[in-house]
Regions:
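Structural signature of the two symmetry-related core transmembrane helices
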Residues: 85-99, 315-331
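Helix-to-loop junctions at the C-terminal end of transmembrane segments
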Residues: 69-82, 167, 300-314, 405
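Helix-loop boundary and gating motifs at the non-cytosolic
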Residues: 6-64, 249-290
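Juxtamembrane intracellular "pre-TM" segments in multi-pass secondary transporters
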Residues: 2-17, 202-255, 445-452
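Intracellular juxtamembrane helix-capping segments at the cytosolic ends
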Residues: 123-136, 360-374
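Glycine-rich segments within core transmembrane alpha-helices of 12-TM secondary carriers
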Residues: 146-164, 387-397
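Hydrophobic core of transmembrane alpha-helices in multi-pass small-molecule transporters
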Residues: 27, 97, 108-124, 342-361
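Central cavity-lining transmembrane alpha-helices of secondary-active solute carriers
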Residues: 57-75, 291-303
Length: 452
């Protein structure tokens, strides 16, 4: 999900009727996302009888497909000046892509399904927020975006809850219910697409991404679909040489966020497989674990904004990264300890869930830091590069984590993750962030003061 912060000049627009009815399609698409978000490790390990190595491969390849797809769809939307059609393509295309699960009886056919899904699903990602902004007066942006975020999050949690209930009730039919969840998700996407076709308006005006330099997207949920569900700024090769070049400090900071995301994925990708393999975790346990992660992230979101204002960026980032290092270190120690499986499983589920609490702090602090380090006219370009490099970090971390965990061990993989994050934390703490501050902005639907 995404939140906005910033201020941009915009003209007066005609107020569409029943505009909050638009959000129904986004609600349904997030329900579908919640249903499928925990399924990759479950499908690969339980349904396909494979291992953590191939969970990493499936995760990284599907993530890799999303990066060029995001850029392609975003550029095509901007070139054609259309928004609604791409949301419909994303939702209806996801319906057809997920139905391919009926052919996914081997790893590579499953990966193929994920790739097709990512390519078509990304059609809606770079346009969803713009469609809302383009149909809303600037003074209403905070309220509209707050409601959009709330609706999207409700959909995500509803999907995870529904998945948890379904998989618990039909626990004895695992080999049927796992692919069936994809089919259910497909039809929810179909309903989202039909709803979008009926109720979504086309944009009343056009906002150029390059002029939205003070509007940024925060990733409230760290790993949904392995990529943001909505972004404003996308990376464009042809724009990198236009205007003033990015400052070295901005580029270096973005590279460090990529390194840290790489470290996060070294932990996140193998961990569900670890508790399945070593503790006998059930499908319900995995769904609960993902649900807790997302709930903790949402709980912390407003607190994170307050932390940046009160403590400052450096302390917020340091506190969050050090907390994650400590938690991952504890997880690595647990892999070498002999403890009763029951308590160890509950501790592990809580560890994974609680990690989501710190993502909100990290996400808001990173985006705010980049906006402060960048030249005002380059902020949009910098955020686009940041979004792309987060994807690169996720891809690389997902790919390598499976091999490390399978060939050397889960404990070693978690230790490597903690070390990588520690190195990134040390380097990122050296940045001076006392640069000219941002103007007034929007955060969770409220005007916020300048970030200290």
């Amino acid at each position: 999900m995404e939140n906005s912060i910033g201020n941009v000049n915009a003209g007066v627009v005609r107020k569409p009727k029943s505009k909050y009815l638009w959000f129904m399609s986004y609600l349904l698409s997030n329900v579908s996302g919640g249903l499928t978000s925990p399924l990759i490790p479950l499908f690969v390990v339980i349904y396909l009888h494979s291992n953590v190595e191939f969970v990493g491969i499936a995760s990284s390849i599907s993530s890799a497909a999303s990066v060029p797809a995001l850029i392609f769809w975003g550029n095509l939307s901007d070139s054609l000046g259309k928004r609604k059609i791409f949301i419909v393509i994303g939702f209806i295309g996801s319906f057809f892509a997920l139905l391919l699960v009926i052919f996914a009886h081997m790893l590579w056919t499953y990966v193929g399904m994920l790739v097709v899904f990512q390519v078509v699903a990304m059609a809606s990602t770079p346009v969803s927020t713009l469609l809302i902004l383009e149909n809303t007066e600037e003074r209403e942006w905070p309220t509209v975006m707050a409601r959009f975020n709330t609706v999207s999050y409700i959909g995500l949690v509803a999907g995870l809850l529904a998945g948890t209930i379904i998989i618990t009730i039909f626990a004895s039919f695992t080999m049927i219910i796992l692919p069936l969840l994809y089919v259910i998700s497909a039809f929810v996407y179909l309903s989202a697409g039909i709803t979008a076709l009926v109720v979504l308006p086309e944009s009343i005006r056009r906002l150029r991404r390059s002029r939205l330099n003070n509007i940024y997207s925060f990733r409230m949920v760290e790993r949904l679909r392995y990529f943001p569900t909505g972004v404003i700024h996308i990376f464009k090769f042809r724009n990198m040489k236009k205007g003033k070049p990015l400052l070295p400090r901005t580029r270096n900071y973005i590279l460090l966020t990529c390194l840290l995301m790489f470290g996060f994925q070294l932990f996140f990708v193998p961990f569900p497989v670890y508790i399945i393999d070593k503790m006998g975790a059930s499908e319900t346990d995995i769904f609960i674990m993902y649900l807790l992660n997302n709930v903790f992230s949402a709980i912390a979101f407003k607190m994170a904004g307050a932390s940046v204002r009160v403590l400052g960026l450096r302390k917020t980032i340091s506190f969050s990264l050090l907390s994650r290092i400590a938690i991952i270190s504890v997880a690595s120690l647990l892999t070498f300890m002999i403890l009763p499986v029951g308590p160890l499983l509950y501790i592990s589920i809580f560890i994974y869930g609680f990690m989501g609490f710190f993502w909100s702090f990290i996400s808001i602090a990173w985006v705010t830091s980049i906006s402060k380090l960048a030249l005002p006219e380059n902020r949009g370009k910098s955020i686009g590069l940041y979004n792309s490099f987060l994807g690169i970090g996720q891809i690389a971390g997902s790919a390598i984590s499976g091999f490390v965990a399978y060939d050397i061990g889960y404990g070693f993989d978690f230790i490597v993750a903690a070390v990588v994050i520690a190195v990134g934390a040390i380097l990122i703490s050296t940045f001076q962030l006392h640069t000219p501050e941002l103007g007034k902005g929007y955060e969770t639907g409220k005007a916020v003061s300048k970030t200290p």
